[in-house]
């Protein structure tokens, strides 16, 4: 999923929580994180949060649930296209919160 995240406009990778967690960011703000055990957490809309968590397709992300992040313990349970779409949406949600100047600098304006 790292390739999918980094293919999104302006996306970067860093390791603020140690080498075992890949954090994907847009404009310095995180939109997805992959853990060493193969799980992934990402930002979703309020509606997607309710649908995904209530249906059992995802669980509230530890430490990030109040900000409407979900966690998938096993990404191989999801179709690649479905997960890629959710990651693109997560990227878009976070990018939309950037200032107009920051979006323009990233080529997103």
PLM features: residue spans?
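Charge-dense, helix-prone N-terminal extensions
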Residues: 1-109
